[in-house]
Structure formats: C-alpha cells, structure tokens
UniProtKB/Swiss-Prot annotation:
Originating species: Homo sapiens
Subunit structure and binding partners: Part of a complex that contains SMG5, SMG7, PPP2CA, a short isoform of UPF3A (isoform UPF3AS, but not isoform UPF3AL) and phosphorylated UPF1. Interacts with DHX34; the interaction is RNA-independent.
Swiss-Prot/TrEMBL keywords: Acetylation, Cytoplasm, Nonsense-mediated mRNA decay, Nucleus, Phosphoprotein, Repeat, TPR repeat
Pfam families the UniProt entry points to: EST1 (PF10374), EST1_DNA_bind (PF10373)
Name of the protein in its database record: Nonsense-mediated mRNA decay factor SMG7
Keyword set includes Membrane: no
GO BP, one annotated term: mRNA export from nucleus
Polar residues compositional bias, start-end: 633-646, 696-722, 988-998, 1069-1081
Repeat (TPR) residue spans along the chain: 152-185, 187-219
Coiled coil segments of this chain: none
Amino acid sequence: MSLQSAQYLRQAEVLKADMTDSKLGPAEVWTSRQALQDLYQKMLVTDLEYALDKKVEQDLWNHAFKNQITTLQGQAKNRANPNRSEVQANLSLFLEAASGFYTQLLQELCTVFNVDLPCRVKSSQLGIISNKQTHTSAIVKPQSSSCSYICQHCLVHLGDIARYRNQTSQAESYYRHAAQLVPSNGQPYNQLAILASSKGDHLTTIFYYCRSIAVKFPFPAASTNLQKALSKALESRDEVKTKWGVSDFIKAFIKFHGHVYLSKSLEKLSPLREKLEEQFKRLLFQKAFNSQQLVHVTVINLFQLHHLRDFSNETEQHTYSQDEQLCWTQLLALFMSFLGILCKCPLQNESQEESYNAYPLPAVKVSMDWLRLRPRVFQEAVVDERQYIWPWLISLLNSFHPHEEDLSSISATPLPEEFELQGFLALRPSFRNLDFSKGHQGITGDKEGQQRRIRQQRLISIGKWIADNQPRLIQCENEVGKLLFITEIPELILEDPSEAKENLILQETSVIESLAADGSPGLKSVLSTSRNLSNNCDTGEKPVVTFKENIKTREVNRDQGRSFPPKEVRRDYSKGITVTKNDGKKDNNKRKTETKKCTLEKLQETGKQNVAVQVKSQTELRKTPVSEARKTPVTQTPTQASNSQFIPIHHPGAFPPLPSRPGFPPPTYVIPPPVAFSMGSGYTFPAGVSVPGTFLQPTAHSPAGNQVQAGKQSHIPYSQQRPSGPGPMNQGPQQSQPPSQQPLTSLPAQPTAQSTSQLQVQALTQQQQSPTKAVPALGKSPPHHSGFQQYQQADASKQLWNPPQVQGPLGKIMPVKQPYYLQTQDPIKLFEPSLQPPVMQQQPLEKKMKPFPMEPYNHNPSEVKVPEFYWDSSYSMADNRSVMAQQANIDRRGKRSPGVFRPEQDPVPRMPFEKSLLEKPSELMSHSSSFLSLTGFSLNQERYPNNSMFNEVYGKNLTSSSKAELSPSMAPQETSLYSLFEGTPWSPSLPASSDHSTPASQSPHSSNPSSLPSSPPTHNHNSVPFSNFGPIGTPDNRDRRTADRWKTDKPAMGGFGIDYLSATSSSESSWHQASTPSGTWTGHGPSMEDSSAVLMESLKSIWSSSMMHPGPSALEQLLMQQKQKQQRGQGTMNPPH
C-alpha cells in the first residue's frame, strides 16, 4: 500500500506546484486545489499511518486551505481594494467549503475506522441510509491513537474555520470536543486560549495557555503566547486603590505570575503577594468569586509551582538559583495562604445553605490533591509559617461528619473539576484511578448530592493521609466508626466578615468612578473593575467578575425569590454604543440611588448569593461582533434564576445527547413566552443613518449553534453580514437585552388573546412614551457598518414565533392576509392558534433561549398565570402541527405588506441580504429541519428538559419544577448545556461573539491560530455569555451544506421544506422556520447590493448541493438560475434589480 501512497505523494507535489504557479488562472488553481484535497483524503483514509508519517494532514490544511484563507483575508483587509466585497464573499464561500470538507472527512474517518466519538453524528441522522465502503480490503488499519489524533486534527481545524468565520461559539464547541478526545495534546487548549484572548478574558487565557503547556504533548506556540500575555500584563500600571474589585484582583494576580514566569522585577513579589492575600480574603468572604474562577486561580498557581520545580523525581537533589528560590518561596506562600482562606470561607458562612458552602470546595480539593502528591512541601518554611491553615482544614473536614466508611468508599467517578483538569501534569497521578469514559453517567439519581458527597469523601481521605504522614499537623481519632480530626495548633480567629459587607457598598459606589478609567483597550481595560456589581437592591447580588469567554452562564442566584437581574446600562465605549433598557429612564434613575436604598437586610441577602463577579467590561470591552447574540442569549446578569449552569470543558457527559449515546438524558430547554413583545421605540431611522448592530442583533440561539436565522443564510458577503437580520427568537433592540430584563418563562404557555393584547398594548404604550429612548445608543457605528441601510427593529415585524400578531393601537389589530385554503377568520382568532405552536417551535430550537423579560411590560405579576410544566406532553408536536402549518402559511402570505407589520414606521430600505434571504422560506425550513437531524435530538428528548444531566452536575436542581418557581419574581433563566458547579460557570464560556458579524478578514483572531492577538478585537462584544455546544456534526447556523446536499431543487413553499426528511428529523425547528419569514420580511425599495445578495444566496445553494466541491461551472449555474427565476415571474420574491 505504501507504493500507492508514495505515488499519491508525488502527484500531490505536482498539484502543489500548480497551485503556486502564477501563470495558471483561477479556474486551474481551483481545480488543482480540489484534486489535492481528494488526493490527501484518499491517503488519510486508506493508509493513515503512512500519511501521518509524511505529515499529510498538515500539508492538507496548509496548502489546500490555510494559504488560500490567508491570501483572501489579506485582500479583504485592504480597504483600498475596489473588489473588497467580492473578496469577502469569496472568503465566506471558501470557508464554507473548508468546513464542509473537514466535516465530511471526519465523518468518513469515523465510518471507515469504526470510531465512535461522543461528538460524532451517526450517518442515519444525516439521512445516509447505508455506509457501504468500496475497496475496504485496501485500507490499512491504523492504531487507535492515530485515529484519535486525526479526528482531533479535524475537530481543531473545524474550530479554526469557525473562528475565521467569527462563529466563536461553534469554534469553542469544536475545540472542546477535540480536547476531550485527546486530553494529553495541548493544541485544543491553545486554541481555546486564543478565543478567550479575543474576548479579553485574560484569566481564562492564562489558564488555557497553562493547560496547553502542562500536558504530555505541549503545543509549542503556547509558551510563546503565554509569555506575550504575561508581558502585556506587566506593562499595565499598578493598582493603587486600597480596596479592589475582583477585576483588580485578577489583574494583580496575573501581574504576580508575570513577575514569576518572566523573572522580572522580583522585588515587587513580596508586597504584591501580601496585597493579593489580603484582598483575596476580603473578596472571598464577599462571595465575589465563583467556583470556576477559584479553580482557575488555583490551577495557575499549581502550573507555576510545577514549572519552577519538577517533582517527577523527588529523590534527586536540585540546586536552584537565588531568583528561582525567591519565586518558589513567594509562590508557595501565596498558594498556601489561598488554601487557608478557601478552607476558612465555608466556616465563616455557617448560616448559609449547605450547597452554597461547597462553592470553594472544588478549589480546596484541587489544592489538596497537589499537596498529597508533593509530601516534601510540608517541610517548607513557608508552610510551617502558615500552620493556622490546619485548624481551619480540620474544622472543614469535621463539618462533613466523617465516618470510617468514607475512607473505604472509593468512587471512580470524576468530579467536574477533575474533568476540567484531565491531562494536567501537575495533578495527573491523582486522576489515574478515575474513569473518564462515562462522563457523569456513573451517577444516577441525586447527582448534586452524590457529587458533593464524593468530594467530601475525597477530602476526608486526603485529611486522613495528612494525619498519617504529618501527625504534628493533624491527628485523626476513630470513635465507634466516626472520625474526628484534631490538632494542637490553636485556631486563628478572623475578623467578622461584616467588613466585607461594608466593602461591598464601597465597591458599588466606586463603580461609576472607575467606568471612565477602565475604558482603554488592552489588559487593563479588559480586566477592569466589575461593572456588573448588582446595584439593584432587588437582586441581592454580589459584585462579581467574569471573564468573557470564560464564563458562559453567570453565577446563579441562590435565593430564587430574588432573581431579578441587575438593571443597568451597558456601554461599549469603543463603539460609542449604549444599550438601553426597555424601561430605561425609570431604571436609570434607580441606578443612581440603588446603593442608598439597599438596606442591611438586603446586603445580608446579598451575602447569600453565590455570584460570579462579572467584569462590566464584558459588555464594554468585549466587542463581540454584533450578530452572535442571535446565537447566544444575552444574559449578563451574574445572578440569574437558579437555572444557570456552566460548562465543563471536556468530558463525554458534557456533550449533548446523541443517538449514539441513548443513555444520555435529554438537554434542558426553556420554553419561550408565547407572546412576543415589541421592544423598541416607534422611531424610524432615516435612510442614511447607520444603526449600530446592537439594534439588529437577536439574543436567542438554537441548540448546538444551528439556529437557522430567518433572513440570514451562510453565503452572504461578509460586508453585508454585520447588521444581520433578526434571529428566530427576537425582534428589535431586544436582541441585546440589558441585564435588567427579566426572563419570562413565567408567561402562560397558552394565554388568552385578551391577555396577549394587553401585554402588547402595554409594551406599545411604553414605546410611545419614549419613542426615541434607544436613540442614544446610536453613538458611532463601526466603520464596516456604514455601507448598509440599517434600521431599528421596533415593532412586531420581528416577532418570529408569533408573526401574525401585529402591534397596533389598543383594540386595533391589523388583519393578516389569509392563506388561500383557510376560511376567513376574525383576526383576533389568529392570535389564539398562534400562541401554542410557537412554544414547541422554540423548545427544541432554543436550548439556551433567553425568554423575554416581563417586568417592563407587565408590572403586576398576578396578571400573568404561571404555566404548567412546560415539558408537559400536551406540547406534542403532533398536536400543534396543523395549526403551525396554518401559521406558517399565514406568515408567508402576509409578509409582503409592510403596512401590516410596521404600522408605526415609514418604510425603511431593508438590507439587501434580508430581502434575498427571505425569498425562499421553504429553503430556510429545509435547512432548519436538516439541522435538527444533525443535532441528533429526538422529539422525546426535546420535550423533557428537566432530565438533562447537565442540570444536575453541580448545585441545585436547576430546572424549575413547580409553579411557584416560575413566578415572575423568580423566572428561571435558561440553562447551559454544560453545568459544573451550581450556578457558577465552570469552563470558559468564551461568550460567543457574533458569528458572521465581522468579515473574516477583519477578525482580530483570524490569522495564525497559534498567535496571540496583539490588540483587542475591533468587533463589538455584546453581552452574550452563553455558548452553544452541540454535537460536532451539528453545523453552526450557517453550516447548511448538509441540508442542501440532499436536494437540488428546493421544495415549493407549501411543502415546508421537509419533503425529503423523515418525521423524526423534521422536528419543530422546521416548523419554526416556516413561520419566520413573515416576521422579518418587509418589502422596500431597491438597494445597491440587492443583486449581489441574491447572487450569493443562489450560489450558496448551488455550492452546497454539489457536496462542497464547487467547480468553475457554479457561476454559470447561478446565472442560469437567475434567468429562470425572472422568467418564472418571481419578481415579488426577488429584490428588484
């Protein structure tokens, strides 16, 4: 077989030469590139070992894809290039093709080598009936490690491609799947660090660079990248404030490690360490950190300790320089001090509920694991100087009520923090007896309680080990099966943490002062003081810091009765955008006096919230490209209702259930409110005004990132994609919901038409009262927005799940054009059938959908009935299908009457791509339905959101299970797919920046994947902390090749685009999309780029249907198709030319 492979290699060299031959035209180069891809794919499939020896996989990426991507990016970045928009379109198409190639290659590798990856989508889910392999006898069977490597390679490059397309949430999903597949390989961690860096989350950036280095196979570029990041931190000014916020602490913490890692200015270590210890204690007692941040801080310390001294062979004597000894001493002192404070923190809060007390315990567990592996550390002088740690540890262990059987009950089930640290060299021996293959499936029943108990048992076991080996520190007595830890060391009494409450007030009042100071880009601004301190008395929240990518879901509110998100205005200083609340003026006034209003009782209530301190700069400086919010709900509030979960990085149990894993519980869904509110003012922007993308960006996203946006398809030129059309869940400015908005899962699932009208009218009344309240957000629009006619989506034309509902004056409901096969109905009747179907439409499509806030519209919670459990079987797809079909047809036929859906606005030129993309609702439905099949979720799973294993990983049962919990005052927030510690985001959220919103060529992280972005990203990060991680086979909302490749001709509109799918795969998302176009369509006059948008949309369908192997004839097909459309008289469907 090697002879044939050698022949393939020779052919590949010829093709590579052709691709670089300047004499050949684009068509010849394209043909050579396609041939090279096919050739390398054959080699990888038939003789993988030989191909890997020859680095075929690297040549495939570099020559067939990366070089061309880099070339197109360079051309598109040149603003003087007259063909810039065409280059961006070509880049978009090429990235689409590259993603399709690697998806198909991964699928073929899994099939040929019979690799059953947790992230793999079975062929049956893709509509492939059989996988007959020809020439199977010619395939050389590779080693399993080689199979894992090549699959990880595909996943990493799929993540890179998604990152170039600014689909950061999808990129993160690919990287995490890759890291889970081979935890000992450092490359996926490096890529995750790049994503974190692009968002400005430096804690997560440093954490993942450390993870990328401290593995068996470190990624070479990670060390350089870490040095750059730490050097940039050292360049920032020193903090002079006496009382730090969490962002100040993290900034100083990173500087401390910069001094140690780079051995610079070591004289600053000791005073900086003392300040860190002091502020860490104060902030921890304020509950300002979340579990994830504490573990990341601990792991960074362990990485540095491991880096300074290799304990692999403790029998050898090593000599260390004076600087090395100084760094070691200061770092070990910091580590031990932090450990003592972590042990003391739960004891200081004995009145708190037990589950909350566990929030520092994961970091304690990680720290104790390391000490157990390094017994010589107990002899260090800095450890002896901190003997006050051991009485606190003893008190903590005794609070677990240890029994003798705890020492013998050995569980191989990994805890979430152990999943997070798979392959981490500093702790690797501690994890050798754990079984990572089952994910969290080893625990059934009360996962939260069992995991808490497992952690306690492991801590008790470590305590017993210390008692056996260091009796001078700890002794253990056995009293009739009960263990009692004792020590002769006196316990150090700390001051009452009431000072922390005072500090909280001071911290809140200083927030406004620090807003201006932290507005500059760079590490300083990124790590600026947490602006999202809950100034709102109602929330009872703590100030909290978050790192943008690191934290997807915010720390949950422990007190469900006080789950109001903080109400404040989020500003993007770099873009001049202010995202205002819907109840803006009232809440703006409240913000000025909230601190004064907070009583001591409220502060005590605040003390009960485990809040991840969220850096306000998350919204200010993250600069997420504007359209990601459509994928990710905007939930910036650190303490939302206790449905928040967060994301372990890589373990099989953390990924959405797939058909290949029937045992996985279904994911959690939050049913959106059946009534869509109009969110914006009634103001119509003039045609020449460029509206910031924040007004155009919907919040919700679908499972696994495959939300098919109404009015948005994949092949729109990047220059047209930033001001994207509304997503299926949103309308108007709500897409960038400020944290002040209340989740609205408490809306009745089937309200009467009357209540619907009331709520709508109430929303309209607010609009009319302040018709221009969103106008201050106009500020400056990013430069690349200027080419578009943007508008504010202020009315019901964006109501995607209830398109027929029009917002008119009270008692005035505009009639909707009826489908030809429906009898005429009273328009008010149209509301009633439309209320129920959208619930099921959204349920499967919006895993982490943020329900619409209710407080701004209905201030009397008693007016809204609490729904029955929204996963009730009454929401059967079969029950609603006919009504949804009517709804969809109504939508389609009513969508071209702007007067109906925009009664309060003058026609505004629509963006050209919206027009072209809404021409084929059936195509949208086809995409959506095929996407659902990719996710692998069955209808049963979609209907039972309460069973997700991710609910139960850490913390409370995050899915509300009673009517009371769904009341407006405690409306649960959506849950993330990946949950670790209760309420605290665990692994980096990398808050999905907007996919497709920035031209790939302009992305700050679109160049070399291993390079650290030297400057903050230029795109606008709206607060979209959630990320959607679907099965790897699941394309992002623009990866639609799978849908199109099954059909050449799109079904007619009446066919709903599901003619080729089975009933199971054509689940609710297809129906959801059927009703989408009416919500986003408004016919307006021609615009400059209409024709190009239509061309791109048509070319996309041709491209995709040809199995991602486009040839030079694609343009000819496109022209033919355009001519046929005009001849068929589809003038109303196409934008005017």
